[in-house]
Amino acid sequence: LQYGPLAXILGE
């Protein structure tokens, strides 16, 4: 993942 609020969570 490179965008969205989960980006920081997933580290992608």
Swiss-Prot record:
Binds 1 FAD per subunit. Keywords: Electron transport, FAD, Flavoprotein, Mitochondrion, Respiratory chain, Transport. GO terms for cellular component: mitochondrial matrix; respiratory chain complex I. Its cofactor is FAD. It is found in: Mitochondrion matrix. Complex I is composed of 45 different subunits. This a component of the hydrophobic protein fraction. Accessory subunit of the mitochondrial membrane respiratory chain NADH dehydrogenase (Complex I), that is believed not to be involved in catalysis. Complex I functions in the transfer of electrons from NADH to the respiratory chain. The immediate electron acceptor for the enzyme is believed to be ubiquinone. Belongs to the complex I NDUFA10 subunit family. This is NADH dehydrogenase [ubiquinone] 1 alpha subcomplex subunit 10. The lineage of its organism: Eukaryota, Metazoa, Chordata, Craniata, Vertebrata.
